[in-house]
């Protein structure tokens, strides 16, 4: 998130004002900027009969925020919502299936093998997988 400061040009009460100078200053300082104004710039504006004031900084948001919205109001808790979501959207591509296999010394070991995908299974996009991982983490915390 970045913040940009917008400046407002205000005429001083006891000075003469020129519309040309006012329009030049307003065009220069009307857009929000991350750059701070130096003292030399402030004194230059004061000599022309104006002053500069910073307005409230605008907040520029990135689109990476994640929102969790429950539309069904008949549910009692978020846990029920997540359970219903996982029931309706089963996790098709579980990343690894773990099974036990004996090695050369007959000691049980666990190996991770990817589950083969069939043609009738639903294809998941990265956003679907991301949502399912979020719901899993919420369920584990509840």
Swiss-Prot record:
Please name the GO terms of the biological process aspect recorded for this protein, alphabetically.
Answer: cell division; chromosome segregation; embryo development ending in birth or egg hatching; positive regulation of cell division; positive regulation of chromosome segregation
Changes seen on gene knockout: RNAi-mediated knockdown results in embryonic lethality. RNAi-mediated knockdown results in chromosome segregation and cell division defects in early embryos. RNAi-mediated knockdown enhances the activity of the PIWI-interacting RNA (piRNA) silencing pathway. RNAi-mediated knockdown disrupts the localization of tofu-6 to the perinuclear region of the germline. RNAi-mediated knockdown results in larger tofu-6-, erh-2- and pid-3-expressing foci.
Q: What is its main location?
A: cytoplasm
Q: In which tissues is it expressed?
A: Expressed in the germline.
- Start and end residues of each stretch annotated as Disordered: 97-123
User: Where, per UniProt, does this protein localize?
Assistant: Cytoplasm; Nucleus
Spell out the residues of the site May be required for interaction with erh-2: 42
Quaternary structure, from the entry: Component of the tost-1 variant of the PETISCO complex (also called the pid-3, erh-2, tofu-6, and ife-3 small RNA complex) containing at least tost-1, tofu-6, ife-3, pid-3, and erh-2, which plays an essential role in embryogenesis. Within the complex interacts with erh-2. Within the complex interacts with pid-3 and tofu-6. In contrast to the pid-1 variant of the PETISCO complex, the tost-1 variant of the PETISCO complex plays a minor role in the biogenesis of a class of 21 nucleotide PIWI-interacting RNAs (piRNAs) that possess a uracil residue at the 5'-end (also called 21U-RNAs).
Protein name from the UniProt record:
Protein tost-1
Species, as recorded = Caenorhabditis elegans
